[in-house]
Amino acid sequence: MLLHILYLVGITAEAMTGALAAGRRRMDTFGVIIIATATAIGGGSVRDILLGHYPLGWVKHPEYVIIVATAAVLTTIVAPVMPYLRKVFLVLDALGLVVFSIIGAQVALDMGHGPIIAVVAAVTTGVFGGVLRDMFCKRIPLVFQKELYAGVSFASAVLYIALQHYVSNHDVVIISTLVFGFFARLLALRLKLGLPVFYYSHEGH
C-alpha cells in the first residue's frame, strides 16, 4: 500500500516536470499531456515491452493516465508558482526514482528473471521516462550528462535485491531501500556528485 501511494505521488510529480519541459518548448495542451505521460509512465512502459510483461502498467490501470493528464493540465494553470516549489519537486523526484526502481526490480523478479535483469529493469523504470521527455523535447537526456541519477537507481536496486536474501519482512526491505536511495539522491544533489564525463573534440572523427 505504501509503495502504491508513493508511486502515485511519483507519477504525479514526474508528470508535472514533464509538463514544464513541454512548456519550455511552447507546446500546446496535447503536447503537454503527451510529454507529461511519457515522463511519468514511459519508463515503466519501456520496461514492460523489453520484458514482454503485458498488459502494460497503464493499460491494466488506466487511472494512471487520468492522474497524469490531470497533473499536466493543472501544471499549465499553476505554472507561475512552480519555481517556488523547486525543493519540493527535488524531494518528490528523489522518492519517485527509488519507488520506480523498486517496482521495476520486483516486476522482473516476479517474472522469474535473475538479479542482473532485475537491476536493468529497475534502472529502465527509474530513468527512461526522463530520457523520453528530453528526446521528445530535442535535448540530450540529463541523465546522460551530469547528474548521479541512474547510479542511485542502480544502487537502490542492488540493495533491494540483496536485502531480500537476508531480511524476511518485505516492508522492512522496501523502507530500507527507500531511505537509502532517497538520501543518496539528495546527497548527490547537495555535493554535485556525478560520473566522469567523456569529452572528445577531434574533428577528424
UniProtKB/Swiss-Prot annotation:
Compartments where located: Cell inner membrane
Family classification: Belongs to the UPF0126 family.
CC terms in the record's Gene Ontology section: plasma membrane
Pfam families in the cross-refs: Gly_transporter
Protein name from the UniProt record: UPF0126 inner membrane protein YicG
Residue ranges of the TM segments: 30-50, 65-85, 88-108, 112-132, 148-168, 169-189
Membrane topology: Multi-pass membrane protein
Topological domain spans for side Periplasmic: 51-64, 109-111
Location (main, coarse): membrane
Lineage: Bacteria, Pseudomonadati, Pseudomonadota, Gammaproteobacteria, Enterobacterales
Keyword terms, alphabetized: Cell inner membrane, Cell membrane, Membrane, Transmembrane, Transmembrane helix
Cytoplasmic side: 1-29, 86-87, 133-147, 190-205
